Amino acid sequence: MPRHHSYSLSDEKVAELVFRQYGVKITPEQIAKAYAPEQRMSWKKSIEVARFITGMTLKQAKAWLEDVVKLKRPIPIKTYKKKQAHHAAPWRGWPVAKWPVKVARRYLQLLENLENNAKFKGLDADRVVIVYAAAHKGYRIPNIMPRAFGRATRFDEQTVNVEIVAAELPKEVIPKRYKLNLVKR
């Protein structure tokens, strides 16, 4: 059963974050939030996706995650990359990447929710930039995995609480391209 949640960032903290990152003062009316509690997906992959989409516009993030679902573009892995394959990457910087399809689908649903929240507040969807995205561990769903000879091993399923905060920014400070520098081959 989902627990009560309050966003980890207040509107004042979001405004301060936007001022530090972009040098623009915004009001609480220019902020849109979305929250997805207790999602059954990988916490580690959720952190990587949240880190990657922070700073993108809403349309850029949706386009990139749709390509992840189609296995056309990967998400660079920065933290949890021990024993991961290093690819001859078509981008500069991070040779370790994954295609977290399940996580990308859940984030696409959340971005759709965020876009609807922004439109409800009267924000221009083309100027909405993701300023904060976070994935927090949720509660564990107890499960049992049957083993040989009548034994059983506890195998808990993890859940993730995901929140995304976006703000409507002036056109001058909106990022124009993705973070990965794609190499033409």
From Swiss-Prot:
Subunit structure: Part of the 50S ribosomal subunit.
GO cellular component entries: cytosolic large ribosomal subunit
Biological process annotations from GO: cytoplasmic translation
NCBIfam families tied to this protein: PRK04223.1, uL22_arch_euk
Protein name per the record: Large ribosomal subunit protein uL22
Function: This protein binds specifically to 23S rRNA. It makes multiple contacts with different domains of the 23S rRNA in the assembled 50S subunit and ribosome. The globular domain of the protein is located near the polypeptide exit tunnel on the outside of the subunit, while an extended beta-hairpin is found that lines the wall of the exit tunnel in the center of the 70S ribosome.
InterPro entries for this protein: Ribosomal_uL22, Ribosomal_uL22_euk/arc, Ribosomal_uL22_sf
